[in-house]
């Protein structure tokens, strides 16, 4: 009888644990979304060419001239780039 109770309890625990793992897998990872759906991109993430506001925060600007990467990626802004982004009035954080 003890064996049956332990086995039943183990199956319930296993079922609950596997459901929580499936829920985590179903959640959409924000980095997997295209930049336009995220609202803004973090540093070293793809961004929209010519749009510094597509990078999150005042520290990020869109850089399309990286020597080792194709495409545009957010990078840390220099002092002048930070000022230019501030005056653009970007809405993201």
Swiss-Prot record:
Gene Ontology CC annotations of this record: extracellular region
Keyword Iron-sulfur: no
Keywords on record: Disulfide bond, Secreted, Signal, Toxin
GO molecular function terms noted in the UniProt entry: toxin activity
Compartments reported by the entry: Secreted
Signal peptide coordinates: 1-18
Tissue expression notes: Expressed by the venom gland.
Modifications the protein undergoes after translation, according to the UniProt entry: Contains 5 disulfide bonds.
Chain positions listed as propeptide in the UniProt record: 19-38
Annotated family: Belongs to the neurotoxin 31 family.
Protein name listed in UniProt: U12-lycotoxin-Ls1a
């Amino acid at each position: 009888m003890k064996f049956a109770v332990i086995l039943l309890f183990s199956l319930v625990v296993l079922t609950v644990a596997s459901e929580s793992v499936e829920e985590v897998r179903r959640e959409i990872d924000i980095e997997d979304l295209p930049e336009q759906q995220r609202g803004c991109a973090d540093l070293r993430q793809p961004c929209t060419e010519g749009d510094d506001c597509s990078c999150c925060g005042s520290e990020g600007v869109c850089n399309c001239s990286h020597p080792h990467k194709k495409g545009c990626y957010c990078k840390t802004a220099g002092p002048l780039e930070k000022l230019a982004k501030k005056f653009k009035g970007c809405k993201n954080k």
